[in-house]
Each structure stands twice: as C-alpha cells, then as structure tokens.
Amino acid sequence: VDVLSTAERLADEVLFPAALTTDTADAVPVDLLDTLAEAGLYGLSGPISAGGVDADFPTVCSVVEKLASGCLTTTFVWVQHLGAVIAAAGSDNAAIGDWVSPLCRGQRRAGLALGGAIPGRPLLRARETENGWTFTGTSPYVSGWNRVDVIHTAARTDDGRLVWALIDARESATLIVERLTLVALNATATVRADLLEHDVPAQRVTSVGPYREGPVPPEPLRIHAALALGVAMRCCRLLGATPLDEELARVRAELDRLDPATIQAARGSAGEVALRAAAALAVATGSRSLLVGDHAQRLIREALFGLVYALRPGSRDAVLVQLRAAP
C-alpha cells in the first residue's frame, strides 16, 4: 500500500470536500473514520502481521500532515489512535496481544488520556489492587468521545510508576465525562474525563514503568507540528505560489532533523507559519472569509488550534519571540 498517495488522495477527495460540514457537526462523521480504517491507516504504525502498515516515522509524519491538510478535525481524532497501536504491539502483557489486530484494522478505535503523564503533580493516579488497578483523577482533554471504543490512559502511582491501560470509553458511576465546547475542532467531541476509583483489570494494562520527568522527546513534538504543517500546506495551496511555500519547506526540514536542541522552537514555528498562512488566505479571500461557509475562517481557527495544542514552554517562548511578544 502506498500510504502517502492514499493519504493525499483521501485528503483531497474525501476529507477536504467534507471539511466545512465536519467543522459544524456535533462529532466527526463515522463514515470518514471508516474510510481511514478501510484504507489501512488505523494500522499505520502497527505490525504487518496484524494488518498494519509498519510505516517508518518520517512516513507517519507525512501521512499526518497530508490528512491534516484535508480536515484537521478528522485527523486529530484518528491520530490519537496511533499511540495505542504502538503500545499494544509492544506490550509485554500477553492479554493485550488480542487487541493488536483489531486496533490495526480499525475494528476497535482508541482515544488518548494523558492525565498521569503530564509533568508536575499527576492529574490521574493509579493504585494497585488484587485484580489490577484503580485510576482516580482527571484527564482534562479526551477527544473522540462516542467515536472511540477505548481510551489509552496514563495514570501515575505514588511510588513513581506510570501505568498505561486501555479503558472502555463508556460513562459509568466511576467514569464521568463533561463535553467541552471548542472554538476549533469542536466536532472532535472532546470531553473532560473524571475517574473515581475506576477499576482497570490487569488484562487491560499495556505497560507499567518508571515515570521520568524531563524534556519532551522530539518525536511527539514532530507529530504535533505535522498537524499545523497540514493546515499551512492547505492554505498555501489555496493561495497559490507565495514565499510562504519556501518558509513552510524550511520549517519542515528543521523539524525532520529531530534535533532535541531545536525541536521545541521548530514546533512553535510550525504553528506560527500556519497562523500567518491562514491569515494571508483570509486577506486574499476578502470579506467572504467571514462567512461560516468559507474555508478561510475554518483554517484560521484550525491554525489557532495547531498553534496552542499541547504547547510546551520551549515552544511557547519561541512563538512569543516570533510574534514579537516575548517579555
């Protein structure tokens, strides 16, 4: 499967034509996610033996960028799934092995809850029990509610271990969600999830290991940047040839180096370029860009999302410098 050609075709022929409708929907249309599954993209990072593509990291980044150029909302719900595939495929827990193929084929779909993995005081705590674990706390942003089957959830123990598990994406007395209203990507159906002594069977645990606080590895920052690059790429295509094309290529090349010393600034640059490209498209479009039926206004809001989503201090500082707003 030529996943790059497939991603480009789906972005141009399926996601982009539906993007304005998706933007105003209550949740991403299921048929769009089904299309990605049928194309094999839910298994992008999964093993071939389980129905995956086993794409290398540069290919994953390119696919994310191409899909994001079609519709950031749909892409964002889908991309949350990829980490669960990698975790399940690499798990030492034999019971998790049964999940790998359904996840790769998109028969089971996963969201992401990072409450226990966020630096500082853990928002989500894990306590070991006779049959597994209980999770208590909050994950402030969980996307894809009612579109995912499980949530790949991180919780931290009092003795400094990080527990990852697949928990059912289903409300209960111990898992309560509150729908959030977003100015961009609202159809991601993002919720705040509160867990109270929520039982997690040992069979659902993908990994348990030491929690290490430190700089974010380059790879997740590169994926975050790919979302913004996709928005910028679509804006550049709608604008036609401009100096922004070369600037976008330079930022992408710097990100591809995965240099720990520059990746945070480069991730910030991706969001800043997307914002300027979207603003340029709005100006070129004129007053039509104020209409909810025009792509320019959607792309400006998506660029805002790409600018601030999961923004780390190093990236934030770099963006403020670029915006000439650094203290």
Predicted regions and their residues:
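A generic structural signal for beta-strand entry/edge sites
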Residues: 130-134, 150, 190
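A generic structural signal for well-ordered coil/turn residues at beta-strand boundaries
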Residues: 108, 120-122, 147-149, 161, ...
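DPxDG-like acidic metal-binding loop motif
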Residues: 138-171
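Glycine-rich beta->alpha junctions and the first turn(s) of the following alpha-helix
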Residues: 178-253
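Glycine-rich flavin
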Residues: 28-38, 42-143
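Alpha-helical interface subdomain recognition
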Residues: 2-49, 53-62, 223-327
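Short loop segments at secondary-structure junctions
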Residues: 91-93, 129-130, 156-159, 169-172, ...
